Every structure is written in structure tokens, then in C-alpha cells.
Amino acid sequence: MASSFVPAALDSPMALTSERVLDALRTVRDPDLGKDLVTLGMVKRHDVEGDRALITVELTTPACPMKDKIRGDIEDAVNKAAAEQKHTLSAIEVEFTADVRRPNEKVGESPLPGVRQIIAVGAGKGGVGKSTIAVNLAVGLARHGAKVGLLDGDIYGPSLPTMLGLGEEQTVARGSMLMPFETHGIKSMSIGKLVEEDKALVWRGPMAHGAFKQLAMQTEWGELDYLIVDLPPGTGDVPLTLAQLLPLTGAVVVCTPQRVAQDDARRAVRMFENLGVEVLGIVENMSHFVGDDGKEYDLFGKGGAEVLAQTMGLPFLGAVPITPGLRINSDSGNPTLNWEDPALASAFDGLSTLTASRISVAASQGKYQMPTISVS
């Protein structure tokens, strides 16, 4: 009598499991960090519900510039795994969250435990628009969902009260702590709100050191993903104090296309290197002016900061043009309006995402330390 057993077809479909999805995600690498999502601990969900794959990935910054590429790579990897299992998917739903991580290695505990990353914005000379870059970098990161603080470290020439529209805001203290101002989606503090508006601070180095330390340590920052510190020009007391006082993740150096600005920016880069602070990149401010005729005018030369970045082996974080709107928005204390200008929005958004990417890489390497100052 013939057997009634009929073997299953070799090509019959098999269920796609969550374990198989996780294996597929091991082939997806974070383009900046250079490792796969599973090894980096970024995969928070990898479920399969019927014909839907549900995946949650925790990025290292809400301003991740590679989000779309990561999404595409995930979809390709999961679709490939489903095809191998002959499992038909109607949807691959990828959700992104973000957690700005502290560096892996630290020397001692941070004096600001609620602050995850501290970034200096500096320049070797004044007049290059360093504060403009610091303000719009902070606002740009906040627009991506990050919790951001901005500290005005320019003790002798504080400009953040004007650029953030803090003129009518009153300084509030609770006990020994100053309450930061909250405007444009960021927290901020400046010496300019603690002294008379027109008063000149004729202070020697130790007094400037003490004032900066008080602003940094006695402001109730709370929980922040990023604290941006707008440094004064030059390589003097405040940058040294900052590097010794706080564990910096890195620094952004601001330059114009002009040769004299490049010379001083080079000195700023060397200063940070001597302090053991990683330079995240160079940004070119005042790159060009667009006239009413629609033509671009290179008032200070062309591409000088990008060339400087290349010669020093540093990332170039982008170029910001001169526009009447940028000047007006800075003077009126409304940087949010810069995102209504397509050229400025593109420049500042690019600066924010590229800087966030560099911060994530620096934090993952975790190489920074509180420096030992040496003179050479």
C-alpha cells in the first residue's frame, strides 16, 4: 500500500522571526561610528507582527545627519531577510529615538552632572561672527529636539543678551543658583545680564576666571544634551579656565575666508590641541554676500576656511553667507527667524547636524581628559 505522506514543498514560506530581524540589523552600520547597530546597542525593538516588521533605533543625537541612510539600510536588510524566509512584508516601520551619550571614558566626575556634552565655540580673533555661529548652532540643535544650553563666556564683550533678545528679561536667583533664561528653545546665561548694560568690565585675569567659573557652575542648567560655550576671542584666560574646569567633548573653530582670520584660526586650533581638546571642525562665516542682482560677491575671499580645514586635516562644517536678514535677526534678538530664509536655514541646519555627528564620534571614542597645562 502506497504511503499517504506528502513531503512539504522545499520552497514553502517560513515565518520571519524577531531573532532573524536582529541578525539582519547586525549588517547595518552607523556611518559615523563605523560599527553595526546591534553592537552599538542602538536597537531597542525588533518585532515581527504578522506582515509588519517593527523596529526602533536609538540614535546618538536627535540631529543625526545620516538618519535617512540608516533607515534605507535597515529596510534593505530586513527585506533581504524576509525574502530569504519567503515571508511577505507589507510594511517595515522604523522609529527613531535619540539619547545623547556621555563619553565612554572620563577622568573624574563632571562638575555639571546633568550636562552630557560640552562644546566650545572659539576663534583666534574677534569680529568673525563667533557668537552668531554659537547662537545658531544652539538653536539648530534644539530645533532637532535636543536639550541645549548656551553659556556666554565672553566676559569682556557679552553679546548674547542682544542676540537672544534678553533685554527685558530679569535675572532670577534661587539660593546660590542662577536660573537660566529660556528663549528660542534653549537655556542661556550671560555676564551681560548680571552687570549694568553699559558697564565696562575692567578686570584682570583672575577676576575673569572667577566670573566665568561662577556662570558655569552656579547656573541651574538641569538636564542638557549639549552645553554650547561661546568663548571670547584669542587664547587667554577664559579658554584656559574652561579647559581646566569642564570636561570638553570638543571645540568648533570659526573663521572667515580672509587670510588674516585663517592665521588666527590656526592658532586657535593649536591652542585647543595643546589643551587636549578635540577640534570637531572649522566653520566659515561671512562666506559670501548675495546682492539684489542675485550674484554672489566674495567680500573676504573665497573658500579660505575650507582650505584651512583641509590643510590641518580637520572636518569642514560648512559655510554661512552674509545676509541682511541675519544681521537684522541678530540685532533684534530673534535667531529663530533665520530658519525662514532658505539659504540660512540650509547653512545652519547643515552646521548643526554635522557638528552633532562629530560630537557623537568624539563621545564614542571617549578620549578626552582634563588637561595638564604646559608652556612650550
What are these regions, as identified by a protein language model?
Residues 118-154, 265, 269:
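Walker A/P-loop phosphate-binding motif and the immediately C-terminal alpha-helix
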Residues 141-203, 209-217:
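Phosphate-binding loop that captures ATP/GTP phosphates
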Residues 222-226, 247-268:
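Conserved Switch II/interswitch segment of TRAFAC-class P-loop GTPases
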